[in-house]
Amino acid sequence: MSVQFIRGTAVADLEAPLIQATKQWLEEDAQHEVFYLVPNHIKFEQEIQVLQKLRQLQTTTSDSITSTRLQVFSFYRLAWYYLQHTPFYSADVLSDAGAAMIFRKILVEAEEELQIFRGEINKPGFIQQLFQLYQEMREGNIEIAELYPFLEKQMENPKGQDLQLKFQDLTLIFTRFQLQMSQYGYESAEIIQHLSEYLQTVDLSNVQFVISGYQQFTARELKLIEVLMAQAGSVKVALLLDKQYPHDLPDPRSLFYEAGQTYHQLYQLARQKQIPILSDYVEKKEVLITNPDLQGLNDYWIQSQEHLPPLSTTDWSGDGLFLWRAENVKEELTHVATEIRRLVVEEGYRYKEIQVLTRDLDCYENLLEPIFAEHEIPVYVDRDMAMDRHPLVEWIESLFAIHSYNYRYRDVLRFLRTELFMPMNQLATSEESLTDWLNQRNAWRRKVDITENVVLAYGYEGYYWSQEKDWEFIRYDFEAEEQEDVATMEEESNAIRQSLQRLLPSYFQAMISAKTGLEAATVFYHFLLQSGVATQLKMWRLQAIEAGQLETARNHEQTWDALMSLLDEYVTVYGESSFDFTTFQEIFVSGLEGLHYSKVPTAIDQVQVRAMDLTRPGAAKVTFAIGMTEEIFPQKIENKTLLSDEERQTINDTLTENQYLRGTTGRKIAQEPFVAYLVFSSARERLYLTYPSVKDTAQEVKPSPYFKNIQKDLNLPVFEKNETTIFDDETTSLA
């Protein structure tokens, strides 16, 4: 067993020595295996890259056999690999929405026992904050009971008393949460801890673990790595780091503080366990960033952030680093798209070799895809789409609003416009029925259109929808001086009204009359079937598959599955409890709104669009970092947790080395220059830094101070990009 650190700055290709070590380990013995551990968000890309580089090193046909003994995993995938046939992995894991249900129930039942958090259940976001703190403490390897001696001492000062009272409430809530999870038969999502315990019983002497792409770890992940170092034949850890920190922690102001702290933690763990520590391998030969301008930018940023003497003036070639100022967001994206097309058509780049980074995807997303489509640029937005945009969520919200506001016409129309309420649809979900279903759907849509016109004209609300009597109305054509023929209008609008009247009043009455959560959940499920929701979603999925829209098809399937899982967890938590309709509505609206679709990574030729925080050195040949404004780069960070920065620091000061809460706001702000470093080093050949002069309603938007410093210190031109730009050499200065 041994551990070795692979170090280097962003210019160096740290993967090269890791791939070489992997090849060497696999060739030494036919029984040897390698697990390459990387963050989940880059696992797919990293797996392709590792296998490609390994094949390039292999010289004979037999060498290809070694790749079958190589796995590229995240920590959680590694847990699945080892624990899939154990009770740890077969147990049901509670979803975030299910956890929120349990916390909600505890807060209601324990309201009179709480002191600080009494009544907070109605505060927006409180339950989410509570669950996040619970997860943070579990990941930080902290048991509240371990804090008792410290908290007792805090009674000596007023602030300490508040902290103690807060943790008394948290102790009560978290203890009951764990107890109820056990009672309901749920396994908490602490799979990393179970993996650590399990691997201590496994012979890993033939296994090499390669850990890459991380700068820091949770306390539980550190414990797992400690087990790997003690049990495995070899452990290699790659860190983006300029120097070693075996005995002392780095200066908190250091650009590489997080990685330096991780180095120090792992070094000390290995030393305490008497695990052999090999000499660091510092990569200096293999270069990841090939453009001299970008190499110079890398050196400049390190020098400026480490407060070292400035570098001598660099001769910039002008073909690697570009600074743009656009007239507005639309023009910014238009010029980015134009340049991408030029790079592909004129310079031979592939779309998949280009990435777009932003920290404000909400601002750019609606414009980005249509503008790129206009320029015929295939694009993949690496972002989990929120489920709250799906019509099923709108259907549930409007259904509950109809009950709450007694058939207010705008709620009824929202409900109908989802096109999920289609009770007459009893078609089978086979391919042969798709045409028939489309005809039926179009006929129903036409009736809804007519109904909407009638409702807007006559203002039908309340009992007009719930009564059995059909609508009757007269329309008079004053020009022709005669009554209009409204028979068809009456017939088709009443068909819609009758469908609602036949199902909704009885459904609402059944829900109100339900005695238990199980009874109410059963009523709700049958209503989903009777109103045609399940069939509609199946047909939407089939329609999307026919059109080749596989992601859309998956989204419909995931939405229905998420609703069914939520319903199952509701029955588990509230099934035997007295039914409360208001709580039911809150749970099912917030439960789906907080979920996201899982996306399947793409390997086809597309431009990748992702968050700046998720990039890595050399991720693409070309990077466009857009929206580089002062409001988001550096990011304005606020503490939105249940613990203040002072409380966090106070608690962290009392914990052992293998325990810690996440950093304070100040610590997170101090990480911003490193995020910028990752962005600036994300391109191997070309980097474009851009920002809009006008954004939303804000005039005279200012560039990021990082953008300004680079322009001023390196004396670079800023290219103006607007609708009237003719020549690329139109420049300006920020000075």
Report residues per predicted region.
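Anion-coordinating catalytic cores for phosphoryl-, nucleotidyl-, and glycosidic chemistry
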Residues: 2-68, 91, 298-735
